């Protein structure tokens, strides 16, 4: 889940009675997707569905954001149960890093001969475009944005040098040499 995108995918499955029998169209989707998701759920009782969905959104949005899969067998989708709506629980704020790390970063940036800013998708998700612009001005550094940061820095700004990598610009590549 390298993009850190909070996604909750709800997939359908064979009936509960057919699970694990190599039935037609049965795929162990929770195992298949395990390497690329933060967490997977297989709902075995309709009474678990609401809490599972709520928990999935909590997991997808807390810490490093990422995808969560909820697999629901076909027979569960046809059932009904009592449901009491609940207020969503707030997503906990990530802990602040140790102040010492910030001070160390400031010293490293101050001592840099050719500072360069490579901005990622966190600029977009934290709505920090203005802070990025101000930081680039303050340290007098060129800025390159990853694919996930497109739109996070004004491309008409004289500090913007384009993307890095396969679809990047020669200017951006020269800045990191």
Please provide the spans of the model-predicted regions:
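N-terminal alpha/beta PP-like core and its mobile active-site loop of ThDP/TPP-dependent enzymes
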Residues: 1-177
């Amino acid at each position: 889940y390298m993009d850190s995108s909070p996604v909750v995918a709800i997939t359908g499955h064979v009936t509960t009675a057919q699970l694990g029998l190599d039935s037609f169209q049965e795929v162990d989707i929770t195992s298949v997707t395990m390497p690329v998701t933060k967490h997977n759920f297989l709902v075995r009782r309709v009474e678990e569905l609401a809490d599972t969905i709520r928990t999935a959104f909590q997991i997808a949005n807390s810490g490093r954001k990422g995808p969560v899969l909820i697999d629901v067998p076909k027979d569960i989708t046809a059932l009904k149960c009592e449901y009491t709506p609940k207020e969503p629980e707030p997503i906990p704020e990530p802990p602040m890093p140790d102040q010492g790390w910030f001070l160390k970063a400031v010293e490293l940036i101050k001592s840099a001969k050719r500072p360069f800013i490579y901005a990622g998708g966190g600029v977009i998700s934290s709505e920090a475009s203005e802070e990025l612009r101000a930081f680039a001005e303050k340290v007098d550094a060129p800025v390159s944005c990853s694919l996930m940061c497109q739109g996070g820095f004004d491309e008409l700004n004289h500090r913007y040098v384009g993307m890095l990598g396969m679809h990047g610009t020669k200017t951006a590549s020269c800045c990191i040499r």
